[in-house]
Amino acid sequence: MLFCKNCGSQNNEGAKFCKQCGTPIGGGSKQANQETASTAETRQAPRKPIPKKTIILWSSIAAACVILFAAYKTGAYFTSKDRLVDKFEQAVNDGDQDQIATLLTPVNDNLKLTKNNVKPFLTYLKDHPDKKDELFASLRDETAQKDIVYAEKDGKSLLVFDHYDLKVAPVYFEVSSNYKNTDLYVNKEEAGSVKKADQAQTLGPYIPGEYTVSAKLKNDVVDLVKKEDIQAIGDSSFRVDLSLEADDVTFSLANDIKSGKGDLLINGKSIHKDPFKSVTYGPLLTDGSMTASVEAEFPWGKTKTAGVPIDDKEMELTLIPDQDTQEQIMNTIVKTTKQYSKALSDGNTAQMTEASANWKAETKDTVDSMKSADSYLKDRYLETDFDLDTFALSQKNDGTWQVSVTGKELHQSSSYNDYTKSEMTDDSPSYEYLLSYDKKQKKWIFEDAESTFESAGTNIKKIKNDKPETYTSAWAGSKNKGSESSASGDVTDEQVTLFMGSYLQSQADAVNQNNFSLMEDSLEKGSSLYSDQQHLVSKLNKEGTTEDFNNYEVKSWSQNGSAITIKTYEEFYITKSGGSPKLRTYNWTYTGVVKNGRIYLTSIQ
């Protein structure tokens, strides 16, 4: 019997096609039977299976190979030069000083890198980005020359991988200075001191970078510092000369100081040396920025003289009175000048209370000479400008202390005779005044005033005559009646013009200095103008307004008995607080009274 392979129906022996589905079945039956038999034989003899242990063994070996290969690759990556350079670059870009100190290996074991001492290196790279780029390019280039940091192979890691270090060579500073025991600093950290003047001291090692090397020397009166910024790159040693710009200075007093005992002060501090003997002290600056003064017992008390700028290695000190003593001296000179002006008009030298007998005698001789020559003087003393830089103390052979100072006076004066008219003009003579200290009277006495050239100094103090008066020679002759005020108190064109000029200037000064007394002697007390101007001075000063008197003109004036009317044109530059000067012009009519030849204003409109 044959069975159809397609539908499984039974067919007769020898059939070629299935009677059920028509599938050919003829001769293939024998082949099929043979295949079936072969398959049966195969099933009867199966292949022997691989042992489980063998499978596990080979699987383990394969896995181990994979792991070892991966581990090798991982180890090679983590120990590679490129990764080390990448980490270093990242640390630099992040400013990670701890990481930089860890990654760098000093060539010299004496250089210990820390978070703090790698900062100069990092600063250099930040300040020079082009150099930073060059550095990392050289680290990655196998053929590049060594830069300040370079990669160097140093043995093996885990006996397999190449190990690299980032090497850095240290730098040193060869520092010298001109004074022994000068302290040396590198980036504000003390690094040593000078053992011998001008002999170099080696400071280091340091990591390459940007540094400030400084030398400091401090004594009782001076703190000297010299600094130099160093870019310590490209070499191993850097020479730095930090010579301090200072000198040992020898002090002595001027030859006209006979005796004394005191204390030499530098910048107001005692160095415990007697200046009345030659003294050498240092180091000190000689550029004029430091001063020397003397504290001593003078007849007028223990005082400290004014400071003299130290501008040389050999200083001959001029003793300069202290500020209070200067004020006393200048006030004495101004008072004597006022008394001298009056004495020249009447010959009365007894009222010269601050003058020496010799100066009184000279004044008397001047008056007698004018009388004998029929010469007259009309004078109004206004002020003196003192050159404070010309003050100097000295001693006479007998030990008497004297002082000299120069000043320029301002007068309105006229010298005339019986045949000329008196015309007052500004006169500005310059004098060198000499005063002596009187121990018995305990005050300064005016000795002399010698004509001199006008001082070119800029340290000037102006002292005004608080109550200027015009004095005329009492012996003036009758041939010049037109030049004098009449007995009735009539005033002249000249008087009116000079009066108004003085009044307007004093008005500006009063406003600027908030000092009404500077102008009140030109005003009638109790008048409306007196009260108004007193209020105005205070008001303008509080507002911060200032006045600069520029020009004026007396357009006309008239006098009727003691009453006077004056019409003026005036120019002032007015500056309000925070503003700029602006020119203001005014036309005023003043009224006033004349008393004993003097004008006193009472109102303005």
From Swiss-Prot:
GO annotation, cellular component aspect: plasma membrane
Top-rank taxon: Bacteria
Keywords: Cell membrane, Membrane, Transmembrane, Transmembrane helix
Pfam families cross-referenced by the UniProt entry: NTF2_YvbJ, TcaA_2nd, TcaA_3rd_4th, TcaA_5th, Zn_Ribbon_1
Keyword hit for Membrane: yes
Membrane topology: Single-pass membrane protein
InterPro entries tied to this protein: NTF2_YvbJ, TcaA_2nd, TcaA_4th, Zinc_ribbon_dom
Membrane-spanning segments: 56-78
Compartments it resides in: Cell membrane
Principal location listed in the UniProt entry: membrane
PANTHER family assigned to the protein according to its UniProt record, in alphabetical order: MEMBRANE-ASSOCIATED PROTEIN TCAA
Protein's UniProt name: Uncharacterized membrane protein YvbJ
Lineage: Bacteria, Bacillati, Bacillota, Bacilli, Bacillales
Gene coding for it: yvbJ
